[in-house]
């Protein structure tokens, strides 16, 4: 993480005096000294603090030192506050690091809050710290915390539809820091807050403890959370196995946040928490019981920066502290301390740049809220309580033969979403258990009465079951007969004689209007050329009076096996708005072809490569959403997967709805190109690495390959630079495919400009083209992801407008085809003139005969100007000369304002009125747009020459004001789009009270411009305005180039 330039000095507690004139920063550390069982022990965290200080030293030209005040081994709630008080009294630190234990952290946090001193820790997981009241207002947790674990558990319950109850078991010896109690506390509070019935019990480490635990489980819940040492879990599971609680009706979540149970130990191998030094029968029972266990751990950051950090951490721990640390999730805490220190330095720098000081601890802590940045532990996201969002992993017995536990899901705390790896959870009964099965807990329910049935009831029940079985059997037989009849009827078959071919331009004319988005060149379906880069038109024809797309199949004949017949039936059955409709197939040799719905706008690749089409992000998100919907439906259908998804296989119909084509009918597909041809490799740019290797894949694997292809298409849509764009590299498709197939780290993927794209969109791309198929999301998850950051959603205005224009143009072509060209030309001129007089949206409403409703705008900026001395000039000139002068001047002005997001309202004589912020709202950009336009007009006037008086200087007087207005159309004859409100009057007063060749702005406009900090303004003073009284006004002098200066 790059830090802005700032002079820092970290003064040592044993270093003596701060250098005169230097701005020193003192860090104080309060952490356990020797006890390595704590993830936040000083020998574990100290190397990370040293590495953070060195990182600051590399980024900043300063002398950096640090010291610590260690505690003696244990988490002492008495020694920790005493140490903190000593540090404050004798060294006055600017930042406290630690403690990690809950009780000491609570004591020290109260002191730090009183001192207004930032307290940064990656421990202190208790839920109570999330409430940043007066006691903990300066506490910042950059590590995991129990409430975030609770959020993950609530998300799990929502996924599995567990909404009734849960049971919690934990070990609590009430000694030291009670880690199990505070960990499960977050789960308890989160589930209780979700209106679940949650019961908890402390596990008794005594004879009879396992029996008490299973009795508690039977009475209180099928979803069980256990937090304690692994030995405790083994004892409970062995008793549960004896009582048949591991039959699939219960699921046991083991909260092992540091994953110690999954690490190799003296009696177990890696990923096998069920192994223990027990008898053979007990070991087998444990292995079977662990099929019902899911382990929850923190997620180790997958980024290479963390791996490098961990290697350096282990080396520094050995060299500086003499301890041997191994790879462990406990090292994540050290990384969180590292990121926390760099985050503090970044925020402190911003605070000083804004005029604050390092003593302003509350301000520094407040600036950390809601911050996002990339650290060594990955993406660091702080919530509004200054607690870091935490990622978790859900582990399950992924391999029943070996018993190895593998990741089943990853949870992203920043996105509040679970990403399933694709490895199924081995539910004993094939599905997750119910958390509230009938008659399990509510025994008072009358339906739970187990009184034996009478003989008459048994006979009636048997008769009913017999009739039901007879009805079901009859239905199945009937369905089977209908299926065979449908297969034999071959409703899909099209004779070659039924397809009519003719002038393609005639089809093109009947396919829809070409007036929208300059799409004449993309009016046919598209195929890739032999070079694999550009598109050519697909074959089209007529079938039963409709234009259809015809795809020829390079096969001599098709054998109608039962499998082929089923493929063709499935193609007829699968119909969806975002899939091209399968019309039929022709199998008459040699004219074998597939006939599908015709989409006149061409392929998605055509549209993306057509530079004349301006695709805004709302339109792009609409195309992406259509593609995701189509693939989600396809994956859930009988066809199951596409297998060859690419942008050229996504076509757009006349209403700009994207549809997927070339799916299904595997028996018809063939590759015509040679194995080493350029076109073949160009088509493989969208192909997943596992398919490039040539190994056959199961259905789920093909679906994950489709997700990879979608990721490449997503990059095409975002950058519009072609498939697999590589910045600065000129590689052939064959070279690209070979690099992807090799799979060497770092994996070869397209280039992404993170500065220009939505961060969540970039993250989705990277997950879709992950090397491991299990890491890729499915289209159901992608649909939810797209829905979150495409908040516009729904049918767009553009889509509705295009649909109406298409329908209107088609009707005209059919009714008056001979006069269409002349009519359209006159219509185009009339519309162009109308759009110059009125805003486009208003003109469309008037064209439809609708009443234009007045619209209120909360904030716009209005520009008024006139010519000083125009009356005298007019008196000395002929009327024709005056008209020529105004025409020259306003033609110049009109050309200039086209470069800005403004709307010209009217010109009356020498008065010129312009507004920004309506009719299209542009957020807060209206004030700077008008300011830049005014400066440009003032600059143009200086060089403007009057034809009949070339030696006279034209003097323009400008007034600008910002405020609310109401806009609407006035009158029926020669309607005008007018603005109303006091803002218009005030803007006029600003102009009339201004001075020649100056820009007179109000205080509200000045405030709006000050938010950018790049405009030069000068106070004019209080000016008496007619009807307004005194108003404070300013002169706009110009705009500074470049960003505001840094401290």
UniProtKB/Swiss-Prot annotation:
It comes from Homo sapiens (Human). It comes from the Eukaryota. Belongs to the adenylyl cyclase class-4/guanylyl cyclase family. It is found in: Cell membrane. Changing residue 708 to C: In AMD1; no effect on subcellular location; changed glycosylation; no effect on C-type natriuretic peptide binding; decreased guanylate cyclase activity. Residues 23-458 are extracellular. Its EC number is 4.6.1.2. The chain crosses the membrane at residues 459-478. Glycans are attached at residues 24, 35, 161, 195, 244, 277, 349. The modification Phosphoserine is found at residues 513, 518, 522-523, 526. Changing residue 187 to I: Does not affect C-type natriuretic peptide-induced signaling. Changing residue 655 to C: In ECDM; the mutation results in increased guanylate cyclase activity. Changing residue 297 to M: In AMD1; markedly deficient activity. Keywords: Cell membrane, cGMP biosynthesis, Disease variant, Disulfide bond, Dwarfism, Glycoprotein, GTP-binding, Lyase, Membrane, Nucleotide-binding, Osteogenesis, Phosphoprotein, Receptor, Signal, Transmembrane, Transmembrane helix. PANTHER family: ATRIAL NATRIURETIC PEPTIDE RECEPTOR 2, GUANYLYL CYCLASE. Gene3D superfamilies: 3.40.50.2300, Nucleotide cyclase, Transferase(Phosphotransferase) domain 1. Receptor for the C-type natriuretic peptide NPPC/CNP hormone. Has guanylate cyclase activity upon binding of its ligand. May play a role in the regulation of skeletal growth. One of its GO terms (biological process) is sensory perception of sound. It is linked to Acromesomelic dysplasia 1: A form of acromesomelic dysplasia, a skeletal disorder characterized by short stature, very short limbs and hand/foot malformations. The severity of limb abnormalities increases from proximal to distal with profoundly affected hands and feet showing brachydactyly and/or rudimentary fingers (knob-like fingers). AMD1 is an autosomal recessive form characterized by axial skeletal involvement with wedging of vertebral bodies. All skeletal elements are present but show abnormal rates of linear growth. Epiphyseal chondrodysplasia, Miura type: An overgrowth syndrome characterized by tall stature, long hands and feet with arachnodactyly, macrodactyly of the great toes, scoliosis, coxa valga and slipped capital femoral epiphysis. This is Atrial natriuretic peptide receptor 2. The keyword Cell cycle does not apply. Residues 513-786 form the Protein kinase domain.
């Amino acid at each position: 993480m790059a830090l802005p330039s700032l002079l820092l000095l970290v003064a040592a507690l044993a270093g003596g005096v701060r250098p005169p004139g230097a701005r020193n920063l003192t860090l104080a550390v309060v952490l356990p000294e020797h006890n390595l069982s704590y993830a936040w022990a000083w020998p574990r965290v100290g190397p990370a603090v040293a590495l953070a200080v060195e990182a600051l030293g590399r980024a900043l030209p300063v002398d950096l030192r640090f010291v610590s005040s260690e505690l003696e081994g244990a988490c002492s709630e008495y020694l920790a506050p005493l140490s903190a008080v000593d540090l404050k009294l004798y060294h006055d630190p600017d930042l406290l690091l630690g403690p990690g234990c809950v009780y000491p952290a609570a004591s020290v946090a109260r002191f730090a809050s009183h001192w207004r001193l930032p307290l940064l820790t990656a421990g202190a997981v208790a839920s109570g710290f999330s409430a940043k009241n007066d006691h903990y207002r300066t506490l910042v947790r950059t590590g995991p915390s129990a409430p975030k674990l609770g959020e993950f558990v609530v998300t799990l319950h929502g996924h599995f539809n567990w909404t009734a109850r849960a049971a919690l078991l934990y070990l609590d010896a009430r000694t030291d820091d009670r880690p199990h109690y505070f960990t499960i506390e977050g789960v308890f509070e989160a589930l209780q807050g979700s209106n679940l019935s949650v019961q908890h019990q402390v596990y008794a480490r005594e004879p009879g403890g396992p029996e008490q635990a299973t009795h508690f489980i039977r009475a209180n819940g099928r979803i069980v959370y256990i937090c304690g040492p692994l030995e405790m879990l083994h004892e409970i599971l062995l008793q549960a196995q004896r009582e048949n609680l591991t039959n699939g009706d219960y699921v046991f979540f083991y909260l092992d946040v540091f994953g110690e149970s999954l690490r190799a130990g003296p009696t177990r191998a890696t990923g096998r928490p069920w192994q223990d030094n027990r008898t053979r029968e007990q070991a087998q029972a444990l292995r079977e019981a662990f099929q019902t266990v899911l382990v929850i751990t923190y997620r180790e950051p997958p980024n290479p920066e963390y791996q490098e950090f961990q290697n350096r951490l282990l080396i520094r721990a050995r060299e500086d502290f003499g301890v041997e640390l191994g790879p462990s999730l406990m090292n994540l805490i050290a990384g969180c301390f590292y990121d926390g220190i760099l985050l503090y330095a970044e925020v402190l720098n911003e605070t000083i740049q804004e005029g604050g000081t390092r003593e302003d601890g509350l301000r520094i802590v407040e600036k950390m809220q809601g911050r996002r940045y990339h650290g060594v532990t990955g993406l660091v996201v702080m919530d509004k309580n200054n607690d870091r969002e935490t990622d978790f992993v859900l582990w399950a017995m992924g391999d029943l033969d070996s018993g190895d536990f593998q990741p089943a899901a990853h949870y992203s705390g920043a996105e509040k979403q679970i990403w399933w790896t694709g490895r199924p959870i081995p539910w004993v009964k094939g599905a997750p258990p119910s958390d509230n099965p009938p008659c399990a807990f509510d025994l008072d329910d009358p339906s739970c009465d187990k009184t034996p049935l009478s003989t008459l009831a048994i006979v009636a029940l048997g008769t009913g079951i017999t009739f039901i079985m007879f009805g079901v059997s009859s239905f199945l037989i009937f369905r089977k007969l209908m299926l065979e009849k449908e297969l034999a009827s071959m409703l899909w078959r099209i004779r070659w004689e039924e397809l009519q071919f003719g002038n393609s331009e005639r089809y093109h004319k009947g396919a829809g209007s070409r007036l929208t988005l300059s799409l004449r060149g993309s009016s046919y379906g598209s195929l890739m050329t032999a070079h694999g880069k550009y598109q050519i038109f697909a074959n089209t024809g007529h079938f039963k009076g409709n234009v259809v797309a015809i795809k020829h199949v390079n096969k001599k004949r098709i054998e109608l096996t039962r499998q082929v017949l089923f493929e063709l039936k499935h193609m007829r059955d699968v119909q969806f708005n975002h899939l091209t409709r399968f019309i039929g197939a022709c199998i008459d040799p040699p004219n074998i072809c597939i006939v599908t719905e015709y989409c006149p706008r061409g392929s998605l690749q055509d549209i993306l490569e057509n530079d004349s089409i301006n695709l805004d992000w709302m339109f792009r998100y609409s195309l992406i959403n259509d593609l995701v919907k189509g693939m989600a439906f396809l994956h859930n259908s009988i066809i199951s997967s596409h297998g060859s998804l690419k942008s050229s296989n996504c076509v757009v119909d006349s209403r700009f709805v994207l549809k997927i084509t070339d799916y299904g009918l595997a028996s018809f597909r063939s590759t015509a190109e040679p194995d080493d041809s350029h076109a073949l490799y160009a088509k493989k740019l969208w192909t997943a690495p596992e398919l490039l290797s040539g190994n056959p894949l199961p259905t789920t694997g093909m679906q994950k390959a489709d997700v990879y292809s979608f990721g490449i298409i997503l990059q095409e849509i975002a950058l519009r630079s072609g498939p697999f764009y590589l910045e600065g590299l000129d590689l052939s498709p064959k070279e690209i495919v070979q690099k992807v197939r090799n799979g060497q780290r770092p994996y070869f993927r397209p280039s992404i400009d993170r500065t220009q794209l939505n961060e969540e969109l970039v993250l989705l791309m990277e997950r879709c083209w992950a090397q491991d198929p299990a890491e890729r999301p499915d289209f159901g998850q992608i649909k939810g992801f797209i829905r979150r950051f495409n908040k516009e959603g729904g049918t767009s205005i553009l889509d509705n407008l295009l649909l109406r224009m298409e329908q209107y143009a088609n009707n005209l072509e059919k009714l008056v085809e001979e006069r269409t060209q002349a009519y359209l030309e006159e219509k185009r001129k009339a519309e162009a003139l109308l759009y110059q007089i009125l805003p486009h949206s208003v003109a469309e409403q008037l064209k439809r005969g609708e009443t234009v409703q007045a619209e209120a705008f909360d904030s716009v900026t209005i520009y008024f100007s006139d010519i000083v001395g125009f009356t005298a000039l007019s008196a000395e000139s002929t009327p024709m000369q005056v008209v020529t002068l105004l025409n020259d001047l306003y033609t110049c002005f009109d050309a200039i304002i086209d470069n800005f997001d403004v709307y010209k309202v009217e010109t009356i004589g020498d008065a010129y009125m312009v507004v920004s912020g309506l009719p299209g709202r542009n957020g807060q950009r209206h004030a700077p747009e008008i300011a830049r336009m005014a400066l440009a007009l003032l600059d143009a006037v200086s060089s403007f020459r009057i034809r009949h008086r070339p030696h006279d200087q034209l003097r323009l007087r400008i007034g600008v004001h910002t405020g609310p207005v109401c806009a609407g159309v006035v009158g029926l004859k020669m309607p005008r789009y007018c603005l109303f409100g006091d803002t218009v009057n005030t803007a006029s007063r600003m102009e009339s009270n201004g001075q020649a060749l100056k820009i007179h702005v109000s205080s509200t406009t000045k405030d709006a411009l000050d938010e950018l900090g790049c405009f030069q303004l000068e106070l004019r003073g209080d000016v008496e305005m007619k009807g307004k009284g005194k108003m404070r006004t300013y002169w706009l002098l110009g705009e500074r180039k470049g960003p505001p200066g840094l401290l």
